[in-house]
């Protein structure tokens, strides 16, 4: 039952691919291949786009499973002491209920109305299969999530207490990290929550010894020795070979058909916009080289040194490089680094869902929001120093925060789009202007005269797939605040029989 809580987050329907399509509405990533739901990238969505339906259903499924486990274990606990495994399992269930609830809450909830949620343990005679109540505000959802994370901390072990076979399970520090993220998003509606963000990140350092890995590359390494650094908080550990596991995302973003060597899918490519932002730190810096490939950049692929070019699908001129380390080995699939099944192209990488670098970014943001720009600079400079970048001189600004968060976490499942949405809603005027500019921009690409020649000349122009935005005859949608929440799938509205109210503006 516990393993069933984790299984969906590994699959294509969540962090394998589907939840990442949402990022097309920001300017860091373009889809690379034409999809049937381009409205998801142009703020014309209805809630019925298949990625939105799929992720909504999968997260609610995890919540339901966790609810069942919690109710059963609490019922047993009322009559007898739980075993050590049952105690840990109760903590895992609380964590995964909070986890899945959170990803629904912030993406669909606002201060005007929350998202549906119920706790099975609140029914004395057992859950009656009634429709979960829609909370009055997303703040009510956040309160439930924090309570579940506190219970998770009560029952879970520390990460260091796990044996090798159990690493990857929820642990105390992971729950504290998600508390920090919940409080940061809660601060969209209540700025006093920034103080809680600072407290949580401090606790991660002082109580749990979390820190940055020595090198930026270590976070995305194919070496098992680097999977569990102090930076690790929670993620999806993957491997390859004949018994692959983890997220298929590394193969999803690989060049379509992998230059005839491996079955990459060619989806989700970097835009020129994120390259332009990252290159502000200097050409060839450690962070940009690990994060993306540009034309002519050398990289190792199945034991061969190549120079990047791309002839497949819709042109962007770049490819995500963060998760490519496992592909560098000769016979990488046969040696267990990447999956031998190109239809499930996992690889040996511990793909982060939340890591300590993000905690420093949240604390820096909290310091800016509470008028401590000097302390914000200290946290941001820890990231910059690790990547061998020039430190910020003097106090940090909101522009510094925007740049560091965008560049450090590029192409991770940290939800850059929601960063823009929350900054537009509640941000300082400086960062709101940056968010508004990106939300209303059309992503750009490099268009090469000869796509098969890495020395070819190029022009910078609009990405050519999101047809409504590229077509001058169709007026672009101007971002406004109601887009902070997605619309519920129409099937959910219908099934609720009136118990679920659609979000404003849809």
Please describe what each predicted stretch is.
Residues 105-112, 160, 185-191, 371:
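Short coil/turn linking the two alpha-helices of tandem helical-hairpin repeats
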Residues 3, 7-8, 35-108, 132-143, ...:
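Conserved, well-structured interaction surfaces
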Residues 280-355:
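Flexible, polar/acidic helix-loop-strand segments at domain edges
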Residues 6, 59-62, 126, 144, ...:
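Long, intrinsically disordered, low-complexity segments
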Residues 1-37, 113-117, 142, 149-153, ...:
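An aromatic- and glycine-enriched ligand-binding surface/loop that stacks and positions planar moieties
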